[in-house]
């Protein structure tokens, strides 16, 4: 049991991604039910409601004010599901709030389990989606108040998140969000990435126009813009970002061959310099691809892990199934494949051509492909 003491960190045991907290008889029943439904959740409730099976169910009980439990939960979990009145929760979490980019999702449920309310980190932290899931599980009413959700328009801070898109900078997210929900003229410029970003059943709102180039969008003089591209903007295009957000879709496949024992530092430097020459963003890399012989190459594995890229390798037979511009008998002699970087990038991306066919630099050979999306 957790003994809560003023000024001391609560000694919790985290197993899942979400914490479910209750302090009333009815709340405990709801919490236990959610613990059974959501396997990635840890249940916490007051020891006075002990049932006898808590250890078996991995339920953690506590004594003392729940207020002293929340700081530990806040820094440990992706989301908190709290079965306490909204007002009480607001008062308890106010002193421990830090930043919308790092605070966990907070969802509140009333004592009868009739309403599930998204309280904190609705978009970035995922509280809105968590609210919908919990409400569906309890057959309760989801309460979501963020303007873009209510109006069913583009949530600027979540745009493309399900595809892995990332912002170049968060500086203009708030003003651009205001332009979207205030129904001002919005330009969506998409040069690469998944096209299925609109997921509502109704059409895209009339104030949102799509463009295939930044120049065309600039000529339309929108109030704000969402720009989706893997490349660096030219100087004359940068005006689009005065009230705009630049998104980096995950669309680049790096094909790579290297000598055994090549350092991660050398591999990383080659990738950085190559993409800079192409005027492509590192943030748009999705995968690092190579031959099966290199599946345990420490330098490749380290770089892929550092950036969170997929690490993919192919057999010589798979690589030889791709027609390449520069087949090498020497490479075939040592690997069984006529090329590594070129066919690996093409296999992963599904592209018919390469943005960079092949470049040799020191111990590394690199090719770059752009993943096409129709």
From Swiss-Prot:
EC number(s) from the headed UniProt entry: 3.7.1.12
InterPro entries: CbiG_hydrolase, CbiG_mid, CbiG_N, CobE/GbiG_C, CobE/GbiG_C_sf, GbiG_N_sf
Gene Ontology biological process: cobalamin biosynthetic process
GO MF terms, alphabetically ordered: cobalt-precorrin-5A acetaldehyde-lyase activity
Biological pathway: Cofactor biosynthesis; adenosylcobalamin biosynthesis; cob(II)yrinate a,c-diamide from sirohydrochlorin (anaerobic route): step 5/10
Pfam families membership: CbiG_C, CbiG_mid, CbiG_N
Catalysed transformations (reactions): Co-precorrin-5A + H2O = Co-precorrin-5B + acetaldehyde + H(+)
Keywords noted in UniProt: Cobalamin biosynthesis, Hydrolase
EC class: hydrolase
Family to which this protein belongs: Belongs to the CbiG family.
Name of the protein described by the UniProt record: Cobalt-precorrin-5A hydrolase
Organism: Priestia megaterium
